[in-house]
Structures are given as C-alpha cells and as structure tokens.
C-alpha cells in the first residue's frame, strides 16, 4: 500500500494524524471517492461505484464504423452535439491529426471520423467557447490548427498563434484572450489577443514576464512566426520567464492553470490580479507525489484533474491546498502515458486515453460513475511562484 492509498482509506482522520494540526485546523475531508479497488477487466483501478469501458483501440475499427482509430491518442475534449456529444482526440504521431467519436444521448458510439490530417505530433490543445478544437503540433516549428468537431469544415492552420513547440492552449472567454504553453525545458507561457473575437487569423502574441513577487506582465514578440534561422519565440524577450516543460493548460473561473513536467508543478494564474502561484509541486506534496504531470482538465464541479505521463499511470485530482489525490490508476502499462481527460456534458462520464496501452497500441476509455458525489474540501490558496 502506498501513501496515497493509505490516505484514501484512512480518510480525514488519518490525514490529520499523519500531517498534524495544520490540516486539523482546516477541517479538511481529504478522501475522494474511497480507496481504489482491484483492477477491473480493463486493468483500471477505480473507486467503488465506478466502471470503465474501452471505446477505441489503435489500429482497429471503432464500434460499428469502418474508421480505424489512429496511433498515440493524446489531448482531447468534449463538445455538445445536436443529438448527443463528441469527444475529439489528437494523435501524437507523424503523420498526426485529430479523430472524433460521436455519441448518442444514451452514450453509445454512433460514428467515428477524422477532423484533421497531415499534421505532425498533435499533442494537446484546447476547446474554444465558439465550439472548435485547437490542436497543437509539438515540433520546433509547430502550428496550431483550428478544427471542426463535426468534421464538416476543414482544419485551418493559425500561424498568428506562433510557430514554436506547442503543447496546449486555453481560451479566456471573459478577457477574450488565449494562453499557450511550450513543451521545452526553457519553454515560455504566451498570450494571444485576436484582433476580432472568434477569429484567430490575426492578433498580438505576447510572452510572460514574472517579477520576484509573482506578478505577471506581458511583452509582445517581435516575430511570432520565426523561420529556421530566426530567433525563436522563447528567446525574443530576454526577460521572459522560462518554464520547465509546459504541458496542459485550462481556464476556469477567471484563472488559468497549467502544468510543467520538468519540475512536476501545476501553476495558477489569477487573471484579475495577474498573480502567479504554485497550486501543486511534487517537491512539497507530503502525500501523493504526483509525478509526470501532463494534460490538465477541470471537472463540472470545478475540480482540477491532472493526467500522469508515466508515474503511477494515474488521473489525479489536485486540491487548492496543493494535495494530489488519485482518482484512478491504470495497471500493466508501464511504458504509456495517460492523456485527454474530459467530461461529457452531464458530468457523469470521463473520457481519456492511454497513449501506448499494454502492447504499444493506444486505447481510449470511458469511466462512468457518481462524480457528483464528491465531497468538497475546505481549501486554501498559498504558495508564491
């Protein structure tokens, strides 16, 4: 039994005894949905009351369709549809692309198809408020492609969002700006302000500067689309802040959350105050030691969900007090990574992928259960960047 499992089994009492009066003073209930059970038929350890199913397997037709699920499924999102919903998933391969699963109102898969093709290493991305998927190429001159989840309109490259080693993008619907991460050891955090809302063909791309107190300012890039001999975007503003391997990023309730894999951190940027804080850091987490932070999502209840690239192959909920608490663990896949967590519109189903599965072939899953039963924590914010 590892420390995370002990915490889940022991609940609030065990956590308070183990970690002292500070947690006792908070009155936190540090359990999630109870201890993880034995692996199910799909090799997934889930809390009691939850169940999983495999939706798609790399190299095989999906359900009753003729569409073959692609290599290395990665970042994903859910979109409402007139007759159900759609889950889209990137393919982190060369060639890459984006594929989609269409669901009927009862959750059955009724169609599968491509919405973007001919791209390279589509890693993560982000959904827009106007219903498109932004798919990011993780290559040195990577682009962002805007994709139609319905698969009707062709995917369109958006070079105005910069040419660099993209990882993910989050859209702030209030400030009408986009935030982007860069997957390099010296990657940057970027902000894009479109000239016209819902049009990403032109705008201003800026890079973040962070002062000693953790406050963020932004400086425009001189050349957002550098060529092979030009200064790369991350080096155009010498005073910009380097982040150690930018990964998933998401907007929620006026804040941006993003992960950095090189130091296993999750950052929180308050857009109202421009203050950057550390929400989670493996180095200071006394419980879970969440490792390999990657894709980030937010549940319908507002809980932060982080997928592990390696580590224990877990999806982990991160509290505002900086604790990482496991929701599920995939067994028997030590050379894979979890990716693409996203909830259906009802909040009862969670979709995600294992990029390489137990045999090198990717799998896309659904987990269904009483997500709304989660008891809220007494949470606090602390930790300066």
Regions inferred by a protein language model and the residue ranges of each:
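Sequence/structural signature of beta-propeller domains
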Residues: 6-19, 23-385
